[in-house]
């Protein structure tokens, strides 16, 4: 009887401890695709152009109390790139630009998310990670702003890149006089509880 009572107490204690540990691990946040956007901003003939990626998925595991444990990943469907013109949209999918047939996805995986120095707690972070476009991977670093919105959170950021680092624009399109080398990938990701 004493053995049974001790075993039952130990089992209940173990289940309770497992429940506490499980609840302490942040669950991935649910991304609201209808409210979230990813776009690329660049200059063509010195005129600003913004194009949207209409299809992407994001995996975010984030707790503002433990930013060092946070993780983020984004997969972008390259064929969803929209310049607002069907002819241009077809052109950028070709080998000289994105080569979407061979490289249908671009991706980002974070390696570090740290609270930004001097910023109010839980609002600004420094993010580093690996960005892969057209089979080329490069380290990127960018500021991230996080704010509460209802029961969810909003993540905003801008990732500066050079398109030629990723071989975007081959042949005659390597000339940065037509299309600038500097590109900013902007994102606005809304999560729900």
Annotate each language-model stretch with its function.
Residues 15-25:
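C-terminal segment of classical bacterial N-terminal signal peptides
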Residues 1-14:
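Bacterial N-terminal signal peptides that target proteins for export
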Residues 24-193:
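Low-complexity, acidic/polar, glycine-enriched regions of mature
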């Amino acid at each position: 009887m004493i053995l049974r009572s001790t075993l039952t107490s130990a089992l209940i204690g173990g289940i309770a401890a497992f429940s506490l540990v499980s609840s302490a691990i942040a669950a991935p946040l649910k991304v609201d695709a209808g409210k979230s956007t990813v776009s690329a901003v660049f200059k063509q003939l010195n005129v600003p152009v913004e194009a949207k990626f209409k299809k992407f998925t994001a995996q975010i595991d984030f707790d503002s109390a433990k930013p060092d444990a946070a993780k983020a990943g984004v997969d972008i469907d390259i064929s969803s790139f929209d310049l607002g013109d069907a002819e241009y949209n077809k052109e950028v999918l070709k080998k000289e630009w994105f080569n979407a047939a061979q490289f249908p996805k671009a991706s980002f995986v974070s390696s570090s998310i740290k609270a930004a120095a001097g910023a109010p707690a839980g609002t600004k972070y420094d993010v580093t990670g690996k960005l892969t476009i057209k089979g080329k991977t490069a380290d990127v670093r960018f500021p991230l702003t996080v704010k509460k919105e209802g029961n969810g959170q909003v993540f905003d950021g801008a990732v500066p890149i050079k398109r030629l680092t990723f071989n975007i624009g081959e042949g005659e399109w390597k000339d940065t006089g037509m299309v600038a080398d500097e590109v900013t990938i902007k994102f606005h990701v809304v999560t729900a509880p």
